Regions:
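Pan-zinc metallopeptidase signature
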Residues: 184-275
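Basic/hydrophobic alpha-helical interface regions
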Residues: 1-212, 228
Length: 275
């Protein structure tokens, strides 16, 4: 495989748009190779010998942002979250941060455990093992849960969706903490830039409640967003809401569990918290 000319990447990064557009630069094979080489150099310490492939495209109308399948990373550089940032260098840092986040999932997310958890739930079983039922009320709630998921296939689908969503929220916080601790250089700096922009974008609890009224959003979406804010940043943007507000109280009741999951290096143990 031909080596990537990283000096040329830096040159193109500083070129005026009249010579090369952001779309041309960020979707070029040169830039994708630059990220692939960066990942290879950074992950060598983990004896991670498989080359991470990068696919970057540009579509401002596509709601897809970024994802990994544990083999490759796909990023939509034309997503409004990226293009609202002005300047090619600034956009480069955001895309680098997005790549660092997805690379974090490749390095630290237990994809097999996550899929097994999903499949077990589909078979009406807990994975890796049942939650601790400390009280008779806990036992009643567990029985009610299984009755609910067995009642209708759509109920099971919803339970799996919620479990997968919460698992991803926890993993987002976990992998970013690991990336920031282990890669303080180029990848860490890009991730910090991304986190700053993302945190500014997170709505307050007051705004989330307003969206429930104006956009018909479910209260779970608000609670999940508050959980994400805490899991990633250790902060909740309350807005004008008191600490007694029900959504805030739900997340407060889960903080010990969230902290336990964020500190666990075992993907299976994080799934126990999800249960």
């Amino acid at each position: 495989m031909a080596r990537v000319n990283h000096k040329l990447v830096k040159q193109r990064l500083n070129e005026k748009r009249s010579k090369i557009t952001d779309r041309q630069f960020f979707t070029s094979r040169l830039f994708a190779g630059h990220l692939e080489d960066l990942a290879a150099a950074q992950t060598r310490r983990y004896h991670y010998n498989r080359r991470v492939r990068v696919n970057i495209y540009w579509n401002s109308k596509d709601s897809f942002f970024a994802a990994t399948d544990n083999m490759s990373v796909k990023i939509n550089a034309g997503h409004p979250f990226i293009t609202k940032t002005k300047g090619r260098e600034n956009r480069y840092q955001i895309i680098l941060g997005v790549f660092a986040h997805e690379l974090g999932h490749i390095l630290y997310t237990d994809f097999l455990a996550g899929q097994t958890h999903h499949n077990y739930l589909g078979a009406h079983k807990w994975y890796p093992y049942p939650p601790v039922l400390a009280t008779s009320a806990d036992a009643r709630r567990e029985n009610a849960f299984w009755e609910y998921v067995k009642e209708d296939p759509k109920n099971l689908e919803m339970a799996q969706y919620i479990a997968d969503y919460i698992s991803n929220v926890i993993d987002d916080g976990y992998v970013e903490n690991r990336m920031l601790a282990n890669f303080p250089g180029k990848l860490g700096y890009g991730l910090e830039e991304l986190r700053q922009v993302h945190f500014e974008d997170i709505p307050t609890v007051t705004q989330l409640i307003e969206k429930e009224d104006t956009e018909g959003r479910h209260i779970f979406e608000s609670i999940a967003q508050i959980m994400l804010s805490y899991a990633k940043y250790g902060e909740i943007k309350y807005g004008e809401e008191p600490l007694s507000e029900e959504r805030i109280q739900v997340v407060f009741s889960l903080i010990n569990d969230i902290d336990t999951a964020l500190m666990s290096r075992s993907g299976k143990e994080r799934l126990v918290v999800i249960n």
